[in-house]
Amino acid sequence: MTTSYLERVISFDSIRISKPTILENGIRGDITITSGGSAKTFRLIYTYSEPVAVDERIAGLILTMPVINFTYFVRELRLDFPVGAADLDLIRHFLKVNAREVFVNKICRRRYEFIRKEYIPAESDINSSNSDGMTEVIAPLSAQGSYEVRGDKKNSAVLSSGGKESLLSYGMLKEIGERTFSFFFNESGGHWITAKTSYDYFSRNFRDVIKVWSNVDRFYKFMQRQVKILDQFAVTRWADTYPLQLFIFPVYIFALIPFLIKHSISSVFIGDEFDDPREMPEFHGLKHYYGIFDQSLDFNRLMSEYFRSIGIDSVLTSAVYPISGNVVEKILLQRYPELFSLQRSCHSCHYENGKIVPCGRCSKCLGIQMFIKAAGGNPTAIGYESISTEELHRRVLSERMRLDSDELSFMKSKLFDNNEPEVSHVTGMHILPGEKNPGELMPDYVRDKIVEILSKYTSGNFSLINGEWVLSEQ
């Protein structure tokens, strides 16, 4: 009998997450992987910037989130801590979604050759049986009751990273009078360098800066060494993405839960800017999220429903989901120049002459430089080298850009052809399918004030009609 593709890529018989150890300002637990009778263990650590109260249920779930990045390759996920029915439903859903995202976007639609050639699927292997994984969750269903945590509508938190979306979200929330907690997650890897400029400035100048330190990036490297389909030489080369990990924001959000409870935070703002729903066709009949499930509105809804189901009165939302990246950059640069100066939108930031600067050449950096120039700014203000528009054009043409096609075409036309379209949805505010007005997915107690700010920098409201974005009548 022929072995299925899914069977061939399995690397672990089980992954076990231990009962967590809870400290005054942190948690830790052991992640044990077994394969063929041998076992290896990694101790995962989270340290909070202030004392927090957390029980075994939440602590165990916090430890579980990084592991889900690798569960496509395991038969059993064993949880040695109490969970409730809502927790188990969420984990099973996460496992299925992440399995398909890894299969489609890291193995089939890969941007880098991290996968050993013998494990690249044949055309006949690309089906739902192989994409949805086989992982069974084994856990004690013993957690009872809910947390009865009331959120204060004046208290919001922003997942802060040094990127334009989180900086703009912070600026708008502060301006409209919210008590805004900036939450930083130091995963002890290169991504912290990206956030450090903002973190250092916020710590010196603003109140309510909260942080978690974790060794999760070291855990990722530990796990990558155990996954047999990975080319261990290829994963050491430079890339602007992880070899397998696509389940990043749940790690941050679950780590934030003890702070949500302690500070009665009612809204968590994540930097989901506009993604054109027309740009997401199925892959061989497989519906997927193009590797950004955890930055989708579906994910926000799912987490908000989960919080409600366990008695935490908080929602996960976005203040920038109606607008494209170029508009985010424009508002940040023109309305909040102090925050703009902190922006480091690059996963390969490094030190030069004592300052943290972006690489300037990855697809993310090239997009940011286009946005800044289009908004009338100077990219050198946030650490980019001084290059001509012609050189930027050459670099853009040679790179696989990761922008929605309409936005990329608009930017090229405006910057490189001096031919800006008169009307384009990429400079407007989007009314998504199911909405009657822009911003309806934001909490009602901040919506109108945020939409008012956005409207000052956009070219009107656009609705999707018969597959085209059409300017609404004013």
Region spans (language model):
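Edge beta-strand plus adjacent loop/short-helix module at the start
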Residues: 159-160
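Low-complexity, highly charged intrinsically disordered N-terminal segments
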Residues: 50-144
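Nucleotide-activated chemistry modules centered on ATP-dependent adenylation/adenylyltransferase
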Residues: 1-30, 109-156, 166-474
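Short Lys/Arg-enriched alpha/beta "domain-start" segment
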Residues: 1-73
